[in-house]
Amino acid sequence: MILVIGLGNPGKEYQYTRHNIGFIAIEKIANQYNSSFSIKKKFNCEIAETISDGQKIIFIKPTTYMNLSGKSVISVKTYYNIQSAKIFVIHDDIDLETGRIKFKTGGGNGGHNGLKSIDGVIGNNYNRIRVGVGRPQNNQDVADYVLNNFLKSEYETALQAIDRIANNFDLILENKLEEFKNKIV
């Protein structure tokens, strides 16, 4: 069993923001496994479940704001008894140019409030799929930048990155993490 978390903020006003790249990605991946989301209030998230090649996959989108994402993660992790090594968090990263992807296990949160919240409840020994959204320019505030919508060209580049993640997601199910890491670059 694996748990895949897409980070973002709830609400239509955030739907196409840089900070919601995790929601955008997880919707694409869940859709390719013919799985749709439903709200689970007891977990503070939208959840989709499926089985692929005998392995259960649980997808979640926290319904809390980003800085409280850990509430959803700990609820689902505890209920399903999922080990941290089987948790994959998809999130935006301003330290990567738009469309660039990096995969890593463990490490710091890089100032990302969603990761800080998750680290606070389960530690940091889980997998991260970092999707680049670029850095703010001209002294723009980081919070304003990530809470603004993508420019059209940026969004197209971000969607190409999401396609690379989705197209290679079976490698995660096969526990071929190094191969996944190399294919999504």
Swiss-Prot record:
Give binding positions for tRNA: Y14, Y65, N67, N113
**Enzyme Commission designation:** 3.1.1.29
Name the site position(s) for Stabilizes the basic form of H active site to accept a proton: D92
Protein localization: Cytoplasm
One Pfam family, short name please?
Pept_tRNA_hydro
**Which domain of life does the UniProt lineage start with?**
Bacteria
The active site of this protein is located at H19 (proton acceptor)
- Molecular function per GO: peptidyl-tRNA hydrolase activity; tRNA binding
Q: Name one GO cellular component term.
A: cytoplasm
Annotated site location: Discriminates between blocked and unblocked aminoacyl-tRNA: N9
InterPro entries reported for this sequence = Pept_tRNA_hydro (IPR001328), Pept_tRNA_hydro_CS (IPR018171), Pept_tRNA_hydro_sf (IPR036416)
Q: Which GO terms describe its biological process?
A: protein quality control for misfolded or incompletely synthesized proteins; rescue of stalled ribosome
Q: Which UniProt keywords apply?
A: Cytoplasm, Hydrolase, RNA-binding, tRNA-binding
Reactions accelerated catalytically: an N-acyl-L-alpha-aminoacyl-tRNA + H2O = an N-acyl-L-amino acid + a tRNA + H(+)
Which family is annotated? Belongs to the PTH family.
Task: Tell me, in a sentence or two, what this protein's role is.
Answer: Hydrolyzes ribosome-free peptidyl-tRNAs (with 1 or more amino acids incorporated), which drop off the ribosome during protein synthesis, or as a result of ribosome stalling.
How does this protein assemble?
A: Monomer.
PANTHER family, A to Z: PEPTIDYL-TRNA HYDROLASE
What's the protein called, per UniProt? Peptidyl-tRNA hydrolase
Its source organism is: Rickettsia felis (strain ATCC VR-1525 / URRWXCal2)
Q: Which gene encodes it?
A: pth
